């Protein structure tokens, strides 16, 4: 794998927002076109929710790719899960016109190296300013009080990771969905589930 900067999402963004998605607008048109790439079986209704959330919050266009089998090269036998950075390596060649970014989505557990731990389970991983990111719904379900909250975590994690590919870093505003969860569910439970004004401005969103 070539040298790239990855940003890790160590916990989900889990609070149901009191307000509906506010549709993002840019005078120049969509900031990116995201290829939504299922890795293994993935419910179509989940894809619908993810697409709607990405379009609404980030103002991106979305194209859907057919499902792909998870690559054997990403499998980590000692923990029986998939390495997120290797999944991104697999996904990156899927960025072909009109797509400018790719988001892989899977229901299986994923991991990366973090906090001095070789194999640390994560919700998602994104290339900062790069082409690819991947999320898993596996941890979205952990300690979730409802299916609705599980789905909200899934969608906001997707927005978070695509945000990293668009150049956003972790945000100091703890209410912003780009905040660094640091692995603490109670931290993400306090987020609004939306981008703050500063992060929206960085993307040129109204």
State each model region's role.
Residues 30-33, 99, 129, 193:
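A structure-centric signal for secondary-structure junctions around beta-strands
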Residues 35, 102-104, 133-134, 177, ...:
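Generic structural signal for residues positioned in beta-strands
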Residues 25-29:
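Cleaved targeting-peptide boundary
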């Amino acid at each position: 794998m070539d040298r790239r900067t990855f940003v890790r999402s160590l916990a989900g963004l889990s609070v149901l927002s009191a307000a509906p998605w506010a549709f993002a607008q840019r005078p120049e048109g969509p900031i990116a076109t995201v290829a939504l790439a299922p890795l293994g079986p993935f419910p179509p209704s989940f894809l619908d929710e993810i697409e709607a959330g990405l379009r609404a919050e980030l103002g991106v266009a979305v194209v859907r790719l057919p499902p792909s089998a998870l690559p054997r090269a990403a499998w980590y036998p000692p923990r029986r899960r998939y390495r997120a950075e290797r999944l991104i390596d697999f996904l990156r060649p899927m960025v072909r016109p009109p797509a400018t970014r790719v988001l892989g989505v899977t229901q299986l557990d994923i991991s990366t190296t973090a906090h001095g731990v070789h194999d640390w389970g994560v919700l998602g991983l994104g290339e900062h300013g790069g082409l690819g990111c991947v999320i898993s719904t596996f941890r979205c379900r952990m300690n979730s009080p409802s299916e609705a909250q599980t789905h909200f975590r899934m969608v906001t994690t997707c927005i978070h990771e695509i945000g990293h590919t668009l150049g956003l870093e972790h945000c100091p505003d703890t209410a912003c969905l780009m905040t660094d969860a640091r692995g603490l569910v109670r931290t993400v439970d306090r987020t609004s589930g939306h981008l703050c004004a500063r992060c929206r401005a960085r993307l040129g969103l109204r």
